[in-house]
Curated annotation (Swiss-Prot):
GO molecular function, one term: RNA polymerase II cis-regulatory region sequence-specific DNA binding
DNA-binding region of this protein: 137-196
Gene name linked to the record: Hoxb7
Region ranges (Disordered): 192-217
Record text on subunit structure and interactions: Forms a DNA-binding heterodimer with transcription factor PBX1.
PANTHER family the record matches: HOMEOBOX PROTEIN HOX, HOMEOBOX PROTEIN HOX-B7
Chief location of this protein within or outside the cell: nucleus
Protein name: Homeobox protein Hox-B7
The keyword Cell cycle appears for this protein: no
Lineage: superkingdom: Eukaryota
Stored SMART domains: HOX
Cellular compartments annotated: Nucleus
Ranges spanned by the short sequence motif Antp-type hexapeptide, renumbered to the chain: 126-131
């Protein structure tokens, strides 16, 4: 079947459509007429004038709708207001302002995080072997705890001079360095000498020999 048959059936089913176009705008032609006629009516300047006039008449009444916005047309069809189409944009803009670099709340949160990191670094425990030993490091007076002093005094009571192996053992036990143990024993020996007033030549030579032996070990 030809396409013209379906077109005629459609227009006969909806008779109201025939009143839109002027009579004679679409002359009835068969499918053979379209194939045999190279110049079809309606595409030229002369025969197509009624069709163009009918089209202008069709859209002339819709000029009032042309000035309306698309949102207004769809809102009127569905019973909504034009402002309802922009309702979904408000939460997005609020969320966008929350992640903006200039947001004061975000800046305050970043400052608090930085302060907490600095506080955590300041509370970080530093052991003696973690301290820097460069030439520019300012040395301070070493303080010993009561437990460390008690253990060192006990060791000094039994032996005033320590071997290197014994210094390593005491340093690991008391969480000190070998240098700290060595300095403490040197100061303790000087204090012991002042208390006992041992200024004899024999005793001084013996202490010097023992000190040299300690350095070699």
């Amino acid at each position: 079947m030809s396409s013209l048959y379906y077109a005629n059936a459609l227009f006969s089913k909806y008779p109201a459509a025939s009143s839109v176009f002027a009579p004679g705008a679409f002359p009835e032609q068969t499918s053979c007429a379209f194939a045999s006629n190279p110049q079809r009516p309606g595409y030229g300047a002369g025969p197509g004038a009624p069709f163009s006039a009918s089209v202008q008449g069709l859209y002339s009444g819709g000029g009032a709708m042309a000035g309306q916005s698309a949102a207004g047309v769809y809102a009127a069809g569905y019973g909504l207001e034009p402002s309802s189409f922009n309702m979904h944009c408000a939460p997005f803009e609020q969320n966008l302002s929350g992640v903006c670099p200039g947001d004061p709340a975000k800046a305050a949160g970043a400052k608090e995080q930085r302060d907490s990191d600095l506080a955590a670094e300041s509370n970080f425990r530093i052991y003696p072997w973690m301290r820097s030993s460069g030439p520019d490091r300012k040395r301070g007076r070493q303080t010993y705890t009561r437990y460390q002093t008690l253990e060192l005094e006990k060791e000094f009571h039994y032996n005033r001079y320590l071997t290197r192996r014994r210094r390593i053992e005491i340093a690991h036990t008391l969480c000190l360095t070998e240098r700290q143990i060595k300095i403490w024993f040197q100061n303790r020996r000087m204090k012991w000498k002042k208390e006992n007033k041992t200024s004899g030549p024999g005793t001084t030579g013996q202490d010097k020999a023992e000190a040299e032996e300690e350095e070699e070990e």
